Amino acid sequence: MNSDISNISLDATPRLTSLSHGGGCGCKIAPGVLSELLAKSNLPKQFFPDLLVGTETADDAAVYKINDEQAIVATTDFFMPIVDDPYDFGRIAATNALSDIYAMGGTPLMALAIVGMPINVLPHDVIAKILEGGESVCRDAGIPLAGGHSIDSVEPIYGLVGIGIVNPKQMKRNADAKDGDVLILGKPLGVGILSAALKKNLLDDAGYRAMVDATTKLNRPGTELAKLDGVHALTDVTGFGLLGHGLELARGAQLSARIDSAKLPMLPGVQALAEQGIFTGASGRNWASYGEHVELASSLTDAQKALLTDPQTSGGLLVSCTQDVVHQVLQVFADSGFAEAAVIGRMEAGAPKVFVG
């Protein structure tokens, strides 16, 4: 008999994280593999004049122009459990999905649920709590959860289709950063490291609360930031880590991104866990996918390197803006409760790479 009972709760309900091989945005297909898969399509590219944002720059959402003042923002995001509490899982997944709309400078209008559950394994009241958590976030965002689709799945999967609206003149892409822009990160890093610690039963209550609080905070500032003329580009930092999404900014603008590792905000307890070698498998896959396009200072420790590739679930907005609006950007974050938003680097002329010092 297997004496390991760590995956079984007192009421014999399996831990959600024990039912999946990955969790949160760490479930993403590695960026290098994804690029290879997408490149295999033999279908000719089609041009749609009103499709303002498609797949070209790996942006956060698709944007389709309705008229000169309105465009639809459409996105979808789902994943397997990053935590064991079903209500928290639903909240985190929903917050993460809606983030893509805010990252385009949009305002959410409604959502549809994507549900895949092992119906004969998980009690139905547990599944109901996941759905309730997702709906609670939609209510917080002021939108209806208007429907969805469900399947019987081997692993638990939950997420949303998000539909939003944006003024095309205020829409922010991830490809429009300018030489000399300042980079600002809206949330602290380390979600992947904390989630890895949780799976190993090494995360204390304070660390868990910090992780859940960060991942259930809606990236609402994106809507207001898009109205600032000096904000050139927006994206959110998710499964490909800070380096991966920073590289997307660099490639889109054909510039270099320079990041100061000493200025990176991180969640409580992350530093100590990283120094113990706690990190996700996705962190290594991320580095394998884009490491050749990154230059790291030789002084960086392994723990610092792990933080840079750490997959973020419902991570912070990454803003590229002019120096003269930095104070305004930080104030928008502060007014929405993002006290740890910080200047972390800049964009500069050069090859599309990321430099970390």
From Swiss-Prot:
SUPFAM superfamilies: PurM C-terminal domain-like, PurM N-terminal domain-like. The active site is at 25. InterPro entries: PurM-like_C_dom, PurM-like_C_sf, PurM-like_N, PurM-like_N_sf, SelD_I, SPS/SelD. Pfam families: AIRS (PF00586), AIRS_C (PF02769). Its EC number is 2.7.9.3. It comes from the Bacteria. GO terms for molecular function: ATP binding; magnesium ion binding; selenide, water dikinase activity. The keyword Nucleotide-binding applies. Binds 1 Mg(2+) ion per monomer. One of its GO terms (cellular component) is cytoplasm. One of its GO terms (biological process) is selenocysteine biosynthetic process. It catalyses: hydrogenselenide + ATP + H2O = selenophosphate + AMP + phosphate + 2 H(+). ATP binds at residues 28, 57-59, 77, 100, 148-150. Keywords: ATP-binding, Kinase, Magnesium, Metal-binding, Nucleotide-binding, Selenium, Transferase. The keyword Cytoplasm does not apply. Gene3D superfamilies: PurM-like C-terminal domain, PurM-like, N-terminal domain. Mg(2+) binds at residues 60, 100, 236. The record marks 28 as: Important for catalytic activity. Homodimer. Synthesizes selenophosphate from selenide and ATP. HAMAP family: SelD. Belongs to the selenophosphate synthase 1 family. Class I subfamily. This is Selenide, water dikinase.
